[in-house]
């Protein structure tokens, strides 16, 4: 309380809770399934490929970023990604949009790795394909009593090119229900 004739002490502003302008705070982007370290790695990639420093990535920059992070990046895919994520219609994506994209891709990549492990259990000869013989062996190990015609039908459903073998891509498509009929 101020004495008569004296000014009260000035009120101090509370410390800033938000990020200071120009400073990146990864904690603002952390969410379940995504660590601060992963956010920093994705931000590092974003900054590396934001070659013009606009804080947004255009199609050419996005293709380079995706390739460097180990993802296949065809032009059609790149333009589709930008179209799907570009909320302001600028034809480019900002960091928040890029983070959303990369988080989805990381999750997809992890899922694909898990499916690869299951595929490898079926591919007993490590030939890169699952054959009727492989399927017969797995069915027997699991105690399933299926005749060859049932097993062959399973192969035929998954086999995309009619060679009586299931490739990993065929298996992945079935497991993710992309081509299951």
Curated annotation (Swiss-Prot):
Residues 14-23 have a biased composition (Low complexity). It is found in: Cytoplasm, Cytoskeleton. Ca(2+) 2 binds at residues 86, 88, 90, 92, 97. The keyword Metal-binding applies. InterPro entries: CALM/Myosin/TropC-like, EF-hand-dom_pair, EF_Hand_1_Ca_BS, EF_hand_dom. GO terms for molecular function: calcium ion binding. The keyword NADP does not apply. It holds the Pfam family EF-hand_7. Residues 37-72, 73-108, 110-145, 146-181 form the EF-hand domain. Ca(2+) 1 binds at residues 50, 52, 54, 56, 61. Coiled coil: none annotated. Keywords: Calcium, Cytoplasm, Cytoskeleton, Metal-binding, Repeat. Residues 1-29 are annotated as: Disordered. One of its GO terms (cellular component) is cytoplasm. PROSITE patterns: EF_HAND_1 (PS00018), EF_HAND_2 (PS50222). It comes from the Eukaryota. Monomer. Belongs to the centrin family. Plays a fundamental role in microtubule organizing center structure and function. Component of the infraciliary lattice (ICL) and the ciliary basal bodies. This is Caltractin ICL1a. It comes from Paramecium tetraurelia. The gene is Icl1a.
């Amino acid at each position: 309380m101020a004495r008569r004739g004296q000014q009260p002490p000035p009120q101090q502003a509370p410390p800033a809770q938000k990020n200071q302008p120009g400073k990146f705070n990864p904690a603002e982007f952390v969410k379940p399934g995504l660590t601060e370290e992963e956010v920093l790695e994705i931000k590092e990639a974003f900054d590396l490929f934001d070659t013009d420093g606009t804080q947004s990535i255009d199609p050419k920059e996005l293709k380079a970023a995706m390739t460097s992070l180990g993802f296949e990046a065809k032009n059609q895919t790149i333009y589709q990604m930008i179209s799907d994520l570009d909320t302001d219609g600028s034809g480019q994506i900002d960091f928040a949009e890029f983070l959303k994209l990369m988080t989805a891709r990381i999750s997809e990549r992890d899922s694909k790795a898990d499916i690869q492990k299951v595929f490898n259990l079926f591919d007993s000869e490590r030939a890169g394909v699952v054959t009727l013989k492989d399927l017969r062996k797995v069915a027997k190990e699991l105690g399933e009593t299926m005749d060859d015609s049932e097993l062959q039908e399973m192969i035929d459903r998954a086999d995309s090119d009619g060679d009586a073998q299931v490739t990993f891509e065929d298996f992945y498509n079935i497991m993710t229900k992309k081509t299951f009929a």
